[in-house]
Amino acid sequence: MAQETFNATGKRKESVARVRIVPGSGKVTINQKPMDVYFGRPVLRMVVNQPFSVTEMENKFDVLVNVHGGGVSGQAGAIKHGISKALVDYDEALRPALKKAGFLTRDARTVERKKYGRHKARKSTQFSKR
């Protein structure tokens, strides 16, 4: 643990988050805005803080995030993934708890592509028997 900052990249759907954690007071800044301003919904703030609550590291790190792409839910998931990877970079002993919670696994689910001859990915035109 020679370095003071720990960097990681998190991904979810179309969102990519570059996360830097620094030992501090627990302040989270996302795209130069406080987390309360960037994420209005409390559920999204809870998702971002999940890695800290699982590892019992609340209010021990300041988090600086650059995130782009996707919507707010995908961005929150990308930040969670990035924070989890940065915490493992900080202390390898945290890996089993984060792995058990599933925070280190990249969620590979993405939007299914639209097919031609259909309205959406799976929605088809109405079937007429006669």
Curated annotation (Swiss-Prot):
Pfam families: Ribosomal_S9
PROSITE patterns: RIBOSOMAL_S9
Taxonomic superkingdom: Bacteria
Gene name of the encoded protein: rpsI
GO molecular function: RNA binding; structural constituent of ribosome
Keyword Hydrolase on entry: no
GO cellular component annotations of the record: cytosolic small ribosomal subunit
Keywords: Ribonucleoprotein, Ribosomal protein
Organism for this UniProt entry: Magnetococcus marinus (strain ATCC BAA-1437 / JCM 17883 / MC-1)
Family per similarity comment: Belongs to the universal ribosomal protein uS9 family.
HAMAP family linked to this entry: Ribosomal_uS9_B (MF_00532_B)
Example of a GO biological process term: translation
Full protein name: Small ribosomal subunit protein uS9
